[in-house]
Amino acid sequence: MTKASSQDASRAKSPSLESPLATALSQLRRAIDQLKLSENDWNTLSTPRRILEVAVPLRRDDGRVEMYKGYRVQYSTTRGPSKGGVRFHQDIDLDETVALAMLMTWKCALTNLPYGGAKGGVAVNPKTLSLAENERLTRRYTSEILPIIGPERDIPAPDVGTDERNMAWMMDTYSVNAGFSVPGVVTGKPIVLGGSLGRTSATGDGVAISVREALKLKGIDPKGATVAIQGFGKVGYWAALALEEMGLKVVAVSDVSGGVTGFKSVADLHKYMQENGTLSNAPGTDSLTNTELLHLGVDVLVPAALSDAITEATASGVKAKIVVEGANAPTTPSGDAIMNDNGVLVVPDILANSGGVIVSYFEWVQDKQNYFWSAEEVKTNLSTILMRAITEVADKAKDEKLTWREAANMIGVARVAQAHRLRGLYP
């Protein structure tokens, strides 16, 4: 690690209480203690492999030049190239980016994908950008991180505030500099550029599978079980659609403006949101706040928006029997402890929302082979990998009297630690 990145890592490891990074580090510390790993393991696993902070200039449509901070954190490359999304969001910072890259590391190891973890992004509100400005910002950010990414090094993907269009621009920018087409440099691309069928819905599909299996393990028939979903975007919408198709009853969903109940069809509600930009005042619905949604008396609650949705202040009101974390880090440690004390089964983010990176892996494999799968093959293979991980976590939690979060973290951390030991320390 360079001197600069070591300083950044040190700065990133002094987070405020219950920040995403503090939460991630506390979970890692607990996993290391439970696994009886050494302080050498802690020192290795708690430190990002590489941190890049860049200035991203943007020429606005009116000719003004504005500067934005960009990041790319490669937390681990021990098990393979690092993998993780690119966020465009005004509130991202180094601490959050390191935390999310760390979670990606354990997520990839838990699902046994041959990847390490990464995360990146630009501190910008994408809603303030024109299409041309978004393209210029995406391409300039790509050019700034270009020396450290590649299909065998670090593979970005869409995240909050980015989509397949951004991935197309990133792939093209990298390919133009390489002198030939390199579709495998990113995943989540349009189908015609080497994307995979099933990638758009993959995270939501994985959440739906996690909900179904958690209900079965709790002895609850999924058919007719009730679900409330906070968030109705890339994860929440597709999860709601898949759950409805499985026969579950999605009784409430929300976006940043608040939530709604009483709708008849998830697809019709989504169409209304696309046409109006909000769920507010959707015909035939009743409104509720996001906090009220968290406290509904449903079988399953799915927080699928941003982090820190369930906190010490809101956790005691959670009445759901099961919480399935569709978002990254939606629960603070204090909120987690309260729900555990209240007997709520929490399916952690690194398991529940791993469908996205699993199908990203499929896309990467297809790009490397130039051989593409059917939608049915993608869904079957996603289910196989995720079901195996769910079974491993559930069995470990039961056998060792752990929470599912503890079991999932221990499995992921143990695999990365083992890989570190087997590779050794150079020189």
Language model segments and positions:
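Adenosine-phosphate binding glycine-rich loop
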Residues: R11, P15-E18, L35, A214-L215, ...
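Flexible, glycine/charged-enriched surface loops at secondary-structure junctions
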Residues: E39-T44, N112, I149-P158, S181-G184, ...
